[in-house]
Amino acid sequence: MGQLRLKMANRANDGFYSVFFLRKFSKLLTWLAVRVKATPNQVTLISFAIGLYSAFCFTKGSFSQTLLGAVLLQISIIVDCVDGELARYTRKFSKLGAWLDAVTDRVKEYMVFLGLAIGAEKSGEDLWVPALVMMLIQTFRHLSDYNFARTVKLRAESQFLTPVDYAADFDGIVPTEREPKGRLRYWLGKIIQFPIGERWLVISTSAVIGGASFTFTVMPILAAISALVVYRGRIARTLKMERLPSRGILISAQQDSLILKLNFIKRFDWLTPSLLRAIETLLLLWIFIINEQINTVTFIIIFTIVFHHYDNLYRSLQNEKKPVWLSCLGLFIEGRLLLLGIAAFGEWNLSYIAWYFALLFLLTSSLQWVLSHRANKVR
């Protein structure tokens, strides 16, 4: 019975690399976690710690440390599979667990980008712009993935499948039609979606083979190919929808803008958060580049802002909004652009702004969310 429950704990709609490699190992760790009575959140934090140490190894820049970082990144994602399997095995699901699993994945991935850029800098390479562009690409894709899936679910169109739910660890998986497909075509479709397993495999292997510069060359190319295929299908499906914006607070809760609304895109409003993030990040990149201030500090500033937008996303997926006071302290898109523009052109010390955003978006906002949901450990 235990073996059957363990087998049934596998998540549906998983990626090729996860199914045929990662979960072969994660099942063993899940069995061990059950025996020692570990909780899903404890496993998530272990995976988080391993992922952060992986990023730290990448900062060293040497081949041996890069190899260690690549191996640890794979171990991190194997352990990351365990928290979901353990939750499904024990039937212990929580909003806190879903939020923690989602945000730690994003932090690990972007800290690895940071680590690779720092390591490359020690070898005389300037890869800050590619690292930031890769973070922007992934943010644009992630937000649109989640929002498209939830929009389809809300519209409840008969021609779409019900998408994977937020609590089921959605990452790069798009709803598929019910028509049967050949096994090869099915798995090729999974791979080209470029989910987290495949992404982290590419990061690990490319960093070992050719270093950070190779990683930041290969990753955007593969991400672009994936986006071309995925968005082609999504646009076709969206054109079949009613010419009306989505209902509820899903999109409005992610606006984070006093002026920019993009209401004109109507049925394509699932793209609104991604487009707003692209506008803000590209303008910040332009400001920092022309002022020659692309470095660790500016990466941290943009990362904390990106984290803030992910926080808004995860709250909206649970039909919640960030408290007004937190949004006001975050200055909205317009306020942040004004502040950072003045600071960059005025040659201020940007470290203070980085600390402010880190304390606000990473610490205060996270604590507010966790404390507000402590009473809902199991749903």
Residue ranges and their predicted role:
Residues 94-98, 320-323:
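Loop-to-transmembrane helix entry/capping segments in MFS-fold secondary transporters
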Residues 36, 49-51, 167-168:
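Short acidic/polar alpha-helix capping motifs at helix-coil junctions
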Residues 40-96, 113, 130-134, 215-217, ...:
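Membrane-embedded alpha-helical segments that form the functional core of polytopic membrane enzymes
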